[in-house]
Amino acid sequence: MSKRKQVTIPIEKIQEQDKYIEQIHRQNEEYFNRTGKRKLVFTQTFGCQMNEHDSEKLCSMLEEMGYQMSMMVEESDLIIYNTCAVRENAELKVYGNLGQLKHLKGKNPDMKIAVCGCMMQQPHVVEELRKKYKHVDLIFGTHNLYKFPQLLTESINSDKMLVDVWDVDGEVIEGLRSNRKFELKAFVNIMYGCNNFCTYCIVPYTRGRERSRTPEDIINEIKELVANGTKEITLLGQNVDSYGKTLENPVSFSELLRKVNDIEGIERVRFMTSHPKDISDEVIYAIRDCDKVCEFLHLPIQCGSSSLLKKMNRHYTKEYYLEIIEKAKKEVPGIAFSTDLMIGFPGETEEDLLDTLDVVEKVRYDSAFTFIYSKRQGTPAAKMENQIPEDIKHDRFNRVLEAVNRISAEINDGYKDRIVEVLVEGRSKNNENKFAGRTRQNKLVNFEGGNDDLIGKLVMVKITEPRTFSLNGILVNN
């Protein structure tokens, strides 16, 4: 594959969007002065942290336009779905939600409906929306997020469906700036796209090829976040271990981790996602050496069968994966692992499933995102023979899930009476009288004691009650 030239949108082009933001803001203010009501927007995000971060940018633009966030579809003037194409279930939810909106649109013709994200990068999806969901007003993809104010302005002034989806070889944006709402924890993109072409995956077709941001841009963004109160950074990429290869002056991911670790004011650094074929010893050493980088590694295996991994085009074996795990355990005491487990890939046998269960037992994951394989149009796996019947998929899924949950509970049981460091994120969602936060190993902890002054601080908590998916405890006097 020839090396692709990275294209960065000039800042002047991004700033051109300000006039559209101001135009909509002016219209929304006039509406408020006339009615006493604010324009409301409902957003829903499907999929990965990349999509979540894109939605943060959209919400920042919407706030600048004068919209207020709403939790109710029925009362909203603008509805936005940021979609995911990785699994069929997420797509079906989007289609179902859009179908339900047809009735609301009939009652309120001024309502605007926008759909964006990875689903929209697939031509057959756009064609489906054109034919069957004509009440949708605006469709745009993953590469032209910065143009949203302009697209929304055009849509508001038109009764026709507006479609603006760029091909992956078109102009792409690196480093979109927005007046985002800074929180305690923040995602920071370090790269975009993927070059791996796993046979089941649609991401290279929807997110494009790998492009890395410069270390300078990444570090400047993090410093800005820290200045506004952010304590924990998660570095994002489809495959962070490939970071830097497309830069004019290549920088490795391990080097970037060390640079980020040196930024003053950061308490914790996390990253995802790593690829087993690309993670280097240097990355493991960086986790070991860098005091702010958390002892936690999300390392998707997908399945434990080397023969299936070859069919998936993953470029590693079960044995190689386990070697990485052992090296990480040796170099980073107390490290926790999470993974992705795909059940029911075409041709999967009982022996293949036993290999997956064997990996689960040997690694002992703290958590695992376990899911059933679903066909993705345009991927090689969708055309493979020996597709697994749904009943067998579900039976195998339940067996793997039982093992994952049992091991997670066993690991958590080992936390009884231990004192752990917790970054306090706020009040517990389940009990307003308690506080919640996470350990360096990404364990959710709900604890008693303290007050709101603790939010954003590192505290010590004694674990009194381990649970399957969380830990309960009490604040230790610091």
Curated annotation (Swiss-Prot):
UniProt-annotated binding residues for [4Fe-4S] cluster 1: 48, 84, 118
Cofactor binding annotation: Binds 2 [4Fe-4S] clusters. One cluster is coordinated with 3 cysteines and an exchangeable S-adenosyl-L-methionine.
GO molecular function, a single term: 4 iron, 4 sulfur cluster binding
Naturally occurring in which organism (per UniProt): Clostridioides difficile (strain 630)
Classification via Pfam families: Radical_SAM, TRAM, UPF0004
Subunit structure: Monomer.
Family matches, as PANTHER family: CDK5 REGULATORY SUBUNIT-ASSOCIATED PROTEIN 1 (PTHR43020), MITOCHONDRIAL TRNA METHYLTHIOTRANSFERASE CDK5RAP1 (PTHR43020:SF2)
Annotated Radical SAM core domain residues: 180-410
Purpose of the protein: Catalyzes the methylthiolation of N6-(dimethylallyl)adenosine (i(6)A), leading to the formation of 2-methylthio-N6-(dimethylallyl)adenosine (ms(2)i(6)A) at position 37 in tRNAs that read codons beginning with uridine.
Domain TRAM: 410-477
Keywords, comma-separated and alphabetical: 4Fe-4S, Cytoplasm, Iron, Iron-sulfur, Metal-binding, S-adenosyl-L-methionine, Transferase, tRNA processing
Protein name, entry field: tRNA-2-methylthio-N(6)-dimethylallyladenosine synthase
Keyword Chloroplast: no
Residues reported in the UniProt entry to bind [4Fe-4S] cluster 2: 194, 198, 201
Example of a GO cellular component annotation carried by this entry: cytosol
Gene coding for it: miaB
Catalytic activity, as annotated: N(6)-dimethylallyladenosine(37) in tRNA + (sulfur carrier)-SH + AH2 + 2 S-adenosyl-L-methionine = 2-methylsulfanyl-N(6)-dimethylallyladenosine(37) in tRNA + (sulfur carrier)-H + 5'-deoxyadenosine + L-methionine + A + S-adenosyl-L-homocysteine + 2 H(+)
Main location: cytoplasm
Location of the protein in the cell: Cytoplasm
Matching CDD domains: Radical_SAM (cd01335)
E.C. code: 2.8.4.3
Cofactor(s) for this UniProt protein: [4Fe-4S] cluster
